């Protein structure tokens, strides 16, 4: 059985008929809208531990700006989350280097967990990633260091003004 995991892109948020337009085979899709890479990796590992019949994993990593924190349970946060934790994190601590280290650490962790399960990784991306000045040790350790991004899948050149829309792609 194939397991799908990721954020709203994998969940099917951009589809008018999410259930009707989905992959035709029987499959679990544990993706959630707004899910951070931290929670996606945790949820994926837990799901596979509880469902050892999974034969293949298709994992979509989210934009690196999403993180999680623990306060009465695990919660996702973004620069637009309206709470004290998010405001403090994104104002005083957040950097592109932290974001990218967290992304590639999550890729590496999931890759290691899935070493005996065939898998495919792809990811959403954001232009601000290009401002990172240092390469990342976790990126160097994973075979997915050059994984396909949503921008690659859309098929327009990087220089095209509509290369990446301002929200979810349309059907």
Predicted regions and their residues:
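Alpha-helical cap/lid subdomain in secreted, periplasmic
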Residues: 45-171
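Serine-esterase "nucleophile elbow" of acetyl-processing enzymes
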Residues: 1-43, 49-50, 170
């Amino acid at each position: 059985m194939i397991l799908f995991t990721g954020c709203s892109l994998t969940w099917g948020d951009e589809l008018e008929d999410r259930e009707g337009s989905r992959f035709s085979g029987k499959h679990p899709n544990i993706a959630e809208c707004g899910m951070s890479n931290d929670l996606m990796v945790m949820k994926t590992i837990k799901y596979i531990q509880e469902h050892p019949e999974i034969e293949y994993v298709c994992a979509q990593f989210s934009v690196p700006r999403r993180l999680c924190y623990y306060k009465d349970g695990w919660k996702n946060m973004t620069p637009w989350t309206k709470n004290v934790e998010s405001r403090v994190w994104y104002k005083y601590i957040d950097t592109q280097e932290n974001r990218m280290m967290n992304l590639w650490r999550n890729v590496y962790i999931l890759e290691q967990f899935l070493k005996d399960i065939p898998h495919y990784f792809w990811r959403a991306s954001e232009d601000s990633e290009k401002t990172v000045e240092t390469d990342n040790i976790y990126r160097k350790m994973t075979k997915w260091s050059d994984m396909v991004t949503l921008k690659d899948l859309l098929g327009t050149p990087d220089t095209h003004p509509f290369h990446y829309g301002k929200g979810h792609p349309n059907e």
